[in-house]
């Protein structure tokens, strides 16, 4: 098995008031992938980034880079660079000198600096902007300058601390494509932190979902979206319908007063569970044809779909994304298939969750 590029082994970070920001965190980062640390403010994602960068020390535990323990290695000796949320550009320097700054500090020859800065500008599509003042650049252009300044030093890892948060929605979407494309061109490891689940789903090879100093679940965007480990992940990653249920037996679950075939298994008979169905997986139909009968409460037009909120006979609330319209107050049916149902156990560890999925997916 290939050695991880970065490893955290039982890392804890505490402050003087004994508040634990990271609680026994362990994970591996492989070379050449795009990773996202995803979670709300205060979950510990920025602390992980700072420990990797050498800007903060772990209270206990070990951090490895290329198989070597780096807890005591200073920040300037680590093969990582950081793009900060505010970009941290020098306003008194033009674009060229901002990008060249780190190379000059390292006393790289002038001709080599010019070659590397020119290549970095080409990579971020800012050819010809060498003499432009930072104050004359748009938000998206400033971000590209910050990225060029980071990649010009040939890091093995690029750390990105919520760099899209200050941009408007359209520009954020454009920069998601650009960052993903740039990572593939460079072939280096990107570690991106955000609280925006859409950014994480769009760009990542792997996502680490954090909450309260713990990594709750890790996996590909598809795995985490389709098979969240618990209520927190299901609710945080996209919109979800989450209702209480009973796992009758393998591939049969009860919720909303009825039993439905599903694709989940490996649980105890009649075990209390939570059931997730994504809004886009619910299909509007007539009450007679629907597996669930519901009453429409409200409807909003969102451009690409209608957002329809409904209530079933037991009081469960359902959110539906549909291209079909519904009328508030009318009774309708909701249709879905076994593969649209995801069943979650209470208090299941990620290790047990992965083992259970493997047991019935093989």
From Swiss-Prot:
Cellular localisation: Cell membrane
The keyword Signal is annotated on this UniProt entry: no
Known EC number: 7.6.2.11
Protein family: Belongs to the ABC transporter superfamily. Spermidine/putrescine importer (TC 3.A.1.11.1) family.
SUPFAM superfamilies referenced in this protein's UniProt entry, alphabetically: MOP-like, P-loop containing nucleoside triphosphate hydrolases
Task of the protein: Part of the ABC transporter complex PotABCD involved in spermidine/putrescine import. Responsible for energy coupling to the transport system.
Gene Ontology cellular component annotations, sorted alphabetically: ATP-binding cassette (ABC) transporter complex
Residues reported to bind ATP: 39-46
Gene3D superfamilies, sorted: 2.40.50.100, P-loop containing nucleotide triphosphate hydrolases (3.40.50.300)
Protein name per its UniProtKB record: Spermidine/putrescine import ATP-binding protein PotA
InterPro entries in the cross-refs: AAA+_ATPase, ABC_SmlMolc_Importer, ABC_transporter-like_ATP-bd, ABC_transporter-like_CS, Mo/tungstate-bd_C_term_dom, P-loop_NTPase, PotA_ATP-bd, Transp-assoc_OB_typ2
A Pfam family this chain is assigned to: ABC_tran
Source taxon at top rank: Bacteria
GO molecular function: ABC-type putrescine transporter activity; ATP binding; ATP hydrolysis activity
């Amino acid at each position: 098995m290939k050695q991880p590029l970065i490893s955290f082994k039982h890392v804890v970070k505490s402050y003087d008031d004994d508040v634990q920001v990271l609680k026994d965190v362990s994970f591996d980062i492989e070379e050449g992938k795009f990773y996202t640390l995803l979670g709300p403010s205060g979950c510990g994602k920025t602390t992980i980034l700072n420990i990797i960068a050498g800007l903060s020390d772990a209270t206990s535990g070990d951090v490895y880079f290329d198989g070597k323990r780096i807890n005591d290695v200073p920040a300037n000796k680590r093969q990582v660079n950081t793009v900060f949320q505010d970009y941290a550009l020098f306003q008194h320097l033009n674009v060229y000198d901002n990008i060249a700054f780190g190379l000059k500090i390292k006393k790289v020859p002038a001709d080599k600096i010019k070659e590397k800065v020119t290549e970095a500008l080409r990579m971020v599509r800012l050819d010809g902007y060498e003499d432009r003042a930072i104050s004359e650049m748009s938000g998206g252009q400033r971000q590209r300058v910050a990225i060029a300044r980071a990649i010009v030093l040939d890091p093995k890892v690029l750390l990105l601390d919520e760099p899209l948060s200050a941009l408007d929605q359209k520009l954020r979407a454009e920069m998601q494509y650009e960052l993903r494309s740039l990572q593939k061109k460079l072939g280096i490891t990107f570690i991106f932190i955000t609280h925006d689940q859409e950014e994480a789903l769009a760009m990542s090879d792997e996502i680490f979902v954090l909450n309260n100093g713990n990594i709750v679940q890790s996996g590909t965007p598809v795995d985490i979206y389709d098979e969240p480990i618990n209520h927190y992940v299901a609710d945080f990653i996209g919109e979800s319908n989450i209702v209480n249920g009973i796992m009758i037996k393998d591939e049969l679950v009860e919720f909303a007063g009825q039993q439905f075939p599903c694709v989940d298994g490996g649980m105890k008979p009649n075990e209390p569970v939570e059931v997730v169905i994504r809004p886009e997986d619910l299909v509007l139909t007539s009450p007679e044809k629907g597996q669930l009968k519901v009453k429409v409460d409200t409807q909003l037009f969102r451009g690409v779909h209608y957002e329809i909120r409904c209530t079933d006979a037991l009081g469960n609330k359902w959110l539906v994304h549909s291209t079909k319209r519904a009328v508030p107050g009318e009774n309708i049916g909701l249709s879905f298939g076994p593969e649209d149902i995801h069943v979650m156990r209470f208090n299941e560890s990620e290790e047990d969750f992965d083992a259970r999925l493997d047991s019935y997916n093989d």
